[in-house]
């Protein structure tokens, strides 16, 4: 699960490597690239109550540099990018991989994975609000008269960002990498130009200052860590977007551009404050001369929009994974590109994110206030990923327990300290990401649990398919009439006679010439090769069982898959084929195994789920739905 996961990388030309690395700069590093706008400013606040000292400034920059080194470089760039699921990364991808080898603690792993996904979705709300606000706030330095318009301008920018999602971003996405690369170069140049303000800032490379500061400051040191962590927000994107770019391009972009640019910019901000303590109110923008402020604000706004776009796209992708893995109900998914199936738009998710983002902007009003709420979701997601990575190296790489503990325990402890520091901000807005993540976790856990209970209940009343076929194939005077054509019955249980088939016989008293029992199954791999897509079993002269396999990153286009299946010899004409779907009317039961409120939530989610004929892209004029009541 390392080099072999991206075999094409071995033969990647320098030109392709360059363009993939450039593309990753915009998508993968957009979020972490906006952190200099506010991270150092926020870290200064807890220690600036009685004036900031030289030791404190150098120590804060030291903490930031070493946070980037340990958490981003060592954990993500060098380690986690190798822990992939057939080339794909991300929390749910890692969960899908671990579910194959989980021994006795599946529920714990699943809950951890769902928490990580929920925290990421919370991050997808906070990132656009914080990033755009922090960029637009630079207008205050251009002219103070614009101070009252920062929130309205931010709302307009964010509204436009969410409105254009339905049209896709393929046409402009090719500019994301170059624009963000320019952003990093501008930040690096600003940092270099100010390091000469006080070369003493270079002492920040010595970890002594970071450690001594924490030991000296005590409680204030812990508080500061919450702000220092803003330096590494966005690191999860490195892992989540692994499948889009591959390991080597992401690593090259980090070491050759992103890491040096971030380090130089933070050093420049530190030297600026050492040379002029009055600049600590906004050290990022005050690095630039007056004439450059407006262009930098415009560039910063573009960079934050790109970062926000990357997070929103990541949320869409994660939701699709969640649906395919059975953690979320079916939702309408629109494809915004004819050639790239990864470019999707999920209207319901877009609406939820938009409402949440606007609420955050209007509620917090400034990036200062919102930054206090930001760290919890990110640190929480990182802790979850580290714990799951521990399980990964034990199960997949066969590391011994002592080796795994020695390698990963320090990272987990460090991230737990960061999480504890961020939890101190609960009363200042830190409760917001906790509430968002809790809500998403409850929804996903309820859907998974409710679906399992429903399948277990229906299995007790279902008729085994083999018995049904054996009975129906016996010729008698009571045999149903046979009609020409093909009937395809969708079912989640290939071993039982589908409810739609039984209802069709009960009400219409007919059986088609050819009857296909179709099951759609998502496997714990991102993609399925076309030659492994289907499994066909002929049960009798008139009945066959077909299983279509999809990866959790794939669109479940059943019509297209069946068209391919015809080439193997399964004869049917799509225009003389009817698709029979069962539609269940769920009724809550006091003995369901879930609390009553959870029953109600599950039923509400089921009722809101997208129509299966739309989700599976079945021809609308060939679909027949037959309903039934089911007590859950």
Curated annotation (Swiss-Prot):
Protein's membrane topology: Multi-pass membrane protein
Top-rank taxon, per record: Bacteria
Keywords: Cell inner membrane, Cell membrane, Ion transport, Membrane, Potassium, Potassium transport, Symport, Transmembrane, Transmembrane helix, Transport
Keyword Cell membrane: yes
Record carries keyword Zinc: no
A GO cellular-component term linked to this record: plasma membrane
Predominant place of localization: membrane
Subcellular location: Cell inner membrane
InterPro entries for the chain: K+_transporter, K_trans_C, K_trans_N, Kup
Reaction(s) the record says it catalyses: K(+)(in) + H(+)(in) = K(+)(out) + H(+)(out)
Regions that span the bilayer: 17-37, 60-80, 106-126, 146-166, 175-195, 210-230, 254-274, 292-312, 344-364, 370-390, 401-421, 426-446
Molecular function GO labels: potassium ion transmembrane transporter activity; symporter activity
Record-linked HAMAP family: Kup
Function (record text): Transport of potassium into the cell. Likely operates as a K(+):H(+) symporter.
Family: Belongs to the HAK/KUP transporter (TC 2.A.72) family.
Protein name (record): Probable potassium transport system protein Kup 1
């Amino acid at each position: 699960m390392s080099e072999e996961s991206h075999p094409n990388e071995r033969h990647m030309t320098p030109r392709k490597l360059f363009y993939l690395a450039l593309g990753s700069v915009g998508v993968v590093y957009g979020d972490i690239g906006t952190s200099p706008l506010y991270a150092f400013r926020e870290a200064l606040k807890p220690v600036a109550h009685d004036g900031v000292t030289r030791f404190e400034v150098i120590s804060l920059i030291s903490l930031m540099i070493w946070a980037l080194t340990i958490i981003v470089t060592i954990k993500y760039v060098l380690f986690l990018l190798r822990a992939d699921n057939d080339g794909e990364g991300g929390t749910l991808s890692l969960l899908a991989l671990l579910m194959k080898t989980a021994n006795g603690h599946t529920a714990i792993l699943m809950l951890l994975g769902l928490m990580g996904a929920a925290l990421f979705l919370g991050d997808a709300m906070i990132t656009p609000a914080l990033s755009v606000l922090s960029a637009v706030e630079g207008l205050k330095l251009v002219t103070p008269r614009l101070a009252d318009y920062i929130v309205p301008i931010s709302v307009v920018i964010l509204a436009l960002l969410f409105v254009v999602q339905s049209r896709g971003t393929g046409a402009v996405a090719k500019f994301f990498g170059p624009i963000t690369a320019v952003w990093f170069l501008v930040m690096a140049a600003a940092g270099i130009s100010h390091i000469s303000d006080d070369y003493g800032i270079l002492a920040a490379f010595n970890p002594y200052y970071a450690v001594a500061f924490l030991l000296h400051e005590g409680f204030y040191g812990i508080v500061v860590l919450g702000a220092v962590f803003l330096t590494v927000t966005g690191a999860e994107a490195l892992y989540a977007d692994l499948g889009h770019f591959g390991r080597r391009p992401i690593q090259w972009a980090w070491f050759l551009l992103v890491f040096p640019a971030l380090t130089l910019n933070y050093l420049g901000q530190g030297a600026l404050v050492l040379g002029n303590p009055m600049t600590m109110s906004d050290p990022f923008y005050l690095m630039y001369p007056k004439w450059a402020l407006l262009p930098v604000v415009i560039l910063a706004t573009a960079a934050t929009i790109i970062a926000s776009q990357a997070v929103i796209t990541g949320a869409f992708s994660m939701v699709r994974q969640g649906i395919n893995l059975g953690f979320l109900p079916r939702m309408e998914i629109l494809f915004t590109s004819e050639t790239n199936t990864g470019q999707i738009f999920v209207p319901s998710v877009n609406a939820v994110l938009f409402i949440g983002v606007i609420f955050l902007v209007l509620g917090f009003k400034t990036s200062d206030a919102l930054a206090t709420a930001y760290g919890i979701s990110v640190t929480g997601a990182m802790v979850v990923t580290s714990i799951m990575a521990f399980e990964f190296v034990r199960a997949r790489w066969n590391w011994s327990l002592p080796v795994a503990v020695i390698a990963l325990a320090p990272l987990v402890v460090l991230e737990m300290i960061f999480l504890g520091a961020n939890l101190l901000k609960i009363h200042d807005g830190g409760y917001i990401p906790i509430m968002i993540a809790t809500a998403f976790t409850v929804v996903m856990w309820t859907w998974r649990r409710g679906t399992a209970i429903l399948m277990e209940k229906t299995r007790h009343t279902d008729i085994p398919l083999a018995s049904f076929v054996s009975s129906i194939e016996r010729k008698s005077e009571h045999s149903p009439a046979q009609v020409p054509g093909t009937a395809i019955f969708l079912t989640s249980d290939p071993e039982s006679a589908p409810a739609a088939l039984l209802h069709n016989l009960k009400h219409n008293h007919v059986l088609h010439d050819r009857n296909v029992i179709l099951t759609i199954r998502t496997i714990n791999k991102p993609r399925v090769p076309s030659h492994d897509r289907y499994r066909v079993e002929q049960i009798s002269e008139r009945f066959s069982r077909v299983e279509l396999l999809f990866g959790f990153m794939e669109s479940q286009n059943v019509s297209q898959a069946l068209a391919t299946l015809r080439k193997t010899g399964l004869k049917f004409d799509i225009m003389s084929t009817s698709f029979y779907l069962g539609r269940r009317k769920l009724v809550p039961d006091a003995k369901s195994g879930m609390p009553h409120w959870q029953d109600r939530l599950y039923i509400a989610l089921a009722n809101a789920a997208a129509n299966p004929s739309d989700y599976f892209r079945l021809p609308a004029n060939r679909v027949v739905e037959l309903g039934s009541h089911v007590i859950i």
